[in-house]
Amino acid sequence: YSLEEEASPIEIINVRVQAVGETDKPVLQTDERVDADPSAAKKEERSVYIPETQEFETVPIYDGHKLSYGHRIPGPAMIEEVTTAIFVSSSFDCIVDKLGSFVLYAKGQEDLIEATLEGAA
């Protein structure tokens, strides 16, 4: 069905535009590697519910903003930041990679942890 009213002005209902362009690849800022001990970032200890045991347990709480490349947090633990909280299960460890990301690994995966710290993974 269509209708043409020659006396009426043209009205555009929808317009879609797609643009493609090239940009320079961003240079990502990396941190210097520090000792694995995260104790300077520890805020407190708090009772936290542990899903594996279905019980509350007192675990260390770390300030995620104070953690740096190379820090290693053994589970169970909590990492808190302004916008998120990360639970590290007792079956996992967490490391901070060179870009500041928190990477969780099953305990015993030392080769993967070291590969991540060296930037190979």
Task: Place the predicted regions along the sequence by residue.
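C-terminal, non-catalytic interaction/recognition modules in large multi-subunit enzymes and RNPs
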Residues: 1-121
